[in-house]
Amino acid sequence: SYLTQALGLTVQNFVSAATGIAVLFALIRGFIKVKSSGLGSFWVDLTRIVVHILLPLNLVISLLLVGGGVIQNLKSAETVSLVEPIAVSAEGEILEDAVIDLDTETVTVDGEIVSNAQIVTEQFVPMGPAASQVAIKQTGTNGGGYMGVNSAHPLENPNAFTNLIEMISILLIPAALCFTFGSAVKNKKQGVAIFMAMFLCLVVALGCIAVTEQVGTPQLAQNGAVNMSMAEQAGGNMEGKETRFGIAGSSTWAAFTTAASNGSVNSMHDSYTPLGGMVTMLLMQLGEVVFGGVGCGLYGMLAFAILTVFI
């Protein structure tokens, strides 16, 4: 139910994000405190992070998503009538150019009656508090999605505006924590250096994914999986991608979500080209150091930096 989701999943989404930031601040205090006997109270840090950072931030993002068309309600799922009926085969495939006679409930294709075809006149539309759940799943690098197909669903991510907001939310806190680190250790150049190292890795990965998805491969072109560019479509490997996002929006999300250990998707990464899919897996296998999860990405990068200094 919506209540169990709010009490279970949503609470854990906030707590998991706050935990990563709290651990990071304990590490930062270990760097800057010399004569102190402690590293602060974890529970105080956790409460402050949730109340002063995560709740206000996600309230704003939720309102932006609702304004962009993401659903946010407590209604049960609805069944609505289609504008016009469609015919599907016994295997569930839509029959193109089918002539439907609702009076006799027959389906005709190329002048022949399809006996096992079914006429669909209604559609199941899920409801619920999606916008608030999407906001924390992104800002907390929790991943997953409210709908089964994640942020590829038009009710969870309906247009380019919501897509932009959700993509920015993935890296918003991990990127900001780099500058927080520089400010905390009273050496902002350190924070900028770490941010630039992460950012350059992300840009290279994003460029590789975008180029390979736009160009495709000869094998995909021969099989008809790579669409030719048209006025309404930029072309490229559009298999597993939403036309409202295209190659650019899908590739950017793929790079961001795998760099930040987020896990949410707006396209199916299994359908990417071999090189494009390889880069997404490489970002995951780097161990959450290209921005990474909230808090844990930065202290992972700091661990690598410390090892590098001594090795």
Placement of each model-derived feature along the sequence:
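Membrane-proximal intracellular helices of multi-pass ion channels
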Residues: S1-I311
